[in-house]
Amino acid sequence: MSRQYFGTDGIRGCTNKDPMTADVAMRVGQAAGAYFKRGLHRHRVLIGKDTRLSGYMVESALMAGFTSVGMDVVLVGPLPTPGVALLTRSMRADLGVMISASHNPFSDNGIKLFGPNGYKLSEEEEKAIEEAIDQPPLLAAPADIGRARRIDDAQGRYIHAVKSSFPESLRLDKLRLVLDCANGAAYQVAPAVLWELGAEVITLGVAPNGLNINDHCGSTDPSALQKKVLETRADLGIALDGDADRVIIVDEKGEIVDGDQIMALIATSAQKRNLLKGNTTVATVMSNLGLERYLSKLGIQLLRTQVGDRHVVEAMRAGGYTVGGEQSGHIILSYHTTTGDGLVAALQVLADLVQSDKKASELLHVFDPFPQLLKNVRYSSGQPLEDESVCEAISEAEESLKGKGRLLIRKSGTEPLIRVMAEAEDPDLVHQIVDHICETVRRAA
């Protein structure tokens, strides 16, 4: 079945265009509500959101959909995605919903669904809900329509849970930190967590107006953070994205520390504390070969999945693994969370920094990354990867990289793009291979 509504991370799109309209959101609420109404108890759904202007519209539409099929609704307001996952489980809700388009601009929005266990829904569950969206809803009798209430202590509950991931014996009172919340969901909770743990906190991106989420700020654009770290002589910078499920670190020299380096540090620390189950770390095919080589020297296997934190989490659950993530900054620690949590990941980095008595630049650049180049080629029609000349160029490149690098070529799941990525110790070889394949794809497209 072709998926009309659900993509790689829930439902996402430009606001007021299919599928991100009020009408579709209401029907998603009705379909998901009917699907999760199992058993004879009163059924409850928890709904959180980030700071986009359209969040009000989507929240109201979902609330109408869920209550119309007899589900009670708990509204928690702006809260990071991992906070919604956490509260869904702790409040014994049948379903959790996060209204967010993550790192996308304010004009986009999305709907992410979590099961009662706090994990994102499986593709099978999404398929069942998708099939019901365009069907007549199973409306509740007038006396059975759901109720809605807003709770005020959701942020406090999440703050407490995040702080519990940080060793009780440690404090951050010797650190000056710059924190960029991307004008997003963590704009209140993240500064509170760091302040309560004793840090001096200098904030960026904490004045959301509905339109400025991820706008030249946050983990996808840490340039302002880098500048502020240098200006204030801070010990470290932390950049979250719009829904705070990913994090990028900046050291005291203004250098970026990506998700691969964060995973390397956390995996090393977890291994020492016997928390690295199966001596395995899970990452995607985009993670740098340098990470794989570094972990291998420690006897740690790197298990690679398709791109997307959903695939990382699925592999972690299937193998019972505890540490995983993506180069983009999604870090999943199953002994603390069920989904990526930028703030929890940042606290693990800070714990290591406090205990090491080193500067961030000395601690956080754990391995030397291989030169890596990624380019996108847009195509208009057809299957350019099946073209004979493209296949030949790919075969030649794979032969050139044999034993000394990696080549990854894939079609985008959301746009008509071919993504070409190569990495090797020789940067000239990397550029030569990527440019040649891109040009061959352009001619074939």
From Swiss-Prot:
UniProt cofactor note: Binds 1 Mg(2+) ion per subunit.
Domain of life: Bacteria
Keyword rRNA-binding appears in the UniProt entry: no
Keyword Metal-binding in annotation: yes
Cofactor(s) needed by this chain: Mg(2+)
Entry annotation: catalytic residues: S102
A Pfam family per the record: PGM_PMM_IV
CDD domains given in the database record: GlmM (cd05802)
GO biological process: carbohydrate metabolic process; peptidoglycan biosynthetic process; UDP-N-acetylglucosamine biosynthetic process
Record GO terms (molecular function): magnesium ion binding; phosphoglucosamine mutase activity; phosphomannomutase activity
Name used for this protein in its record: Phosphoglucosamine mutase
Natural source organism: Zymomonas mobilis subsp. mobilis (strain ATCC 31821 / ZM4 / CP4)
